[in-house]
């Protein structure tokens, strides 16, 4: 099974002009996107809560969370974001993908438009 990456922008929803380009690993098993904390701080995005998460190996970790804007292929969405710590890779999670209207095709390892439902 391969790894899917995308180039997307992250920004503070209160300051739309300043954006940072990142390479995200698309993780269809992750509910939320993760961006390194230093980038979120640079954009003025502040955490509003701390949540516990379980990793694939069973370890339990805690991470700060906030709200960030994301842009990909001209689509823009706002979504919860995890503040990544040192060593954490930028991840694009399902909540953000659905906000864009995309889903990961597991066979072709690419993003495809999804059928939107109310």
Residue ranges and their predicted role:
Residues 1-118:
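Pepsin/retropepsin-fold aspartyl endopeptidases
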